[in-house]
């Protein structure tokens, strides 16, 4: 029951405070661990395709074991000392694992810059949350990129970690966070990460397979509650949920596009190179600045529904 209470507290603290930059974040430590482990395995394994594939697998095991074991041991000691101490520590961990408020806040920085109408400012703001080249994007392309980011990251930044937290408390939440961070840092198709990042990328796909689809359905339900076009959301999800190189990324993005009645995705430049991508959704209307706060409201509603569902599952597991 303590895990469930910690999740509830962590969720609401996240909504209240987000991720203050003045507080050290565990993902930064996980990132440093990944960098150190990468250097180690690159020295230990041969620089061949097979050698780097194996190195990536060993790296993945090292990082998830350490990232899971450390919080588990800390929580064990805290709960042994006093249940209240354990609850406080686990609540803080749950808060830091979730990213609901920060995802919305970062998108709203883009919205505020767009409202000011200064291209340099809104391009800079969106560059903080997307990986594509932003120097030549116009205002509507920036708006589209911000909406896509909220929609896509609703799953791996909020709903998926919440599911892992509900099932196994903070240690399992950190297990997921470590795996997801490895994919973000190493899961590229270009060298020097193409081979060593293969296992981290594939494991992230596996771990997100069910959460991404749950997130899509929960987002669809949230959109219906908000009065959005749930019928079109369902239609676009059924049609476009595979319109991405990743098996999971288009799940929530397609739902969001359908609910809003806009077209997302399409070709984009990365490091000066054009990447051809299929569109997601139909342009029933032109995308507009207000779609960014709409996506934020959809994110919050989806997160709230997820908390209710996953909290109920956790409650039944401990009954």
PLM region spans:
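Glycine-rich phosphate/dinucleotide-binding loop and adjoining beta-alpha-beta core of small-molecule
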Residues: 184
């Amino acid at each position: 029951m303590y895990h469930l209470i910690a999740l509830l507290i962590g969720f609401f603290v996240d909504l209240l405070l987000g991720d203050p930059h003045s507080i050290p974040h565990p993902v930064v430590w996980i990132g440093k661990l990944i960098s150190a482990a990468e250097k180690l395995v690159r020295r230990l394994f041969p620089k061949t395709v097979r050698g780097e594939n194996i190195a990536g697998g060993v790296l993945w095991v090292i990082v998830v074991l350490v990232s899971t074991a450390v919080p588990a041991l800390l929580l064990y000691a805290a709960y042994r000392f006093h249940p209240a101490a354990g609850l406080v520590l686990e609540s803080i961990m749950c808060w830091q694992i979730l990213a609901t408020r920060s995802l919305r806040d970062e998108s709203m920085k883009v919205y505020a810059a767009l409202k000011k109408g200064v291209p340099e400012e809104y391009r800079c703001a969106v560059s903080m949350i997307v990986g594509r080249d932003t120097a030549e994007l116009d205002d509507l392309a920036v708006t589209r990129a911000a909406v896509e980011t909220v929609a896509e990251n609703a799953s791996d930044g909020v709903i998926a970690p919440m599911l892992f937290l509900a099932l196994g408390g903070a240690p399992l939440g950190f297990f997921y966070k470590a795996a997801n961070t490895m994919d973000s840092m190493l899961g590229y198709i270009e060298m020097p990460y193409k081979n060593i990042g293969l296992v981290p990328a594939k494991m992230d796909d596996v771990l997100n397979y069910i959460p991404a689809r749950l997130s899509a359905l929960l987002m669809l339900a949230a959109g219906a509650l908000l009065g959005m076009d749930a019928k079109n959301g369902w239609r676009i999800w059924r049609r476009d949920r595979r319109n991405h190189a990743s098996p999971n990324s288009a799940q929530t993005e397609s739902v969001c596009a359908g609910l809003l009645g806009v077209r997302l995705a399409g070709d984009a430049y990365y490091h000066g190179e054009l990447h051809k991508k299929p569109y997601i959704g139909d342009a029933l209307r032109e995308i507009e600045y207000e779609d960014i706060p709409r996506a934020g409201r959809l994110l919050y509603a989806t997160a709230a529904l997820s908390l209710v569902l996953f909290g109920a599952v956790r409650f039944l597991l401990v009954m």
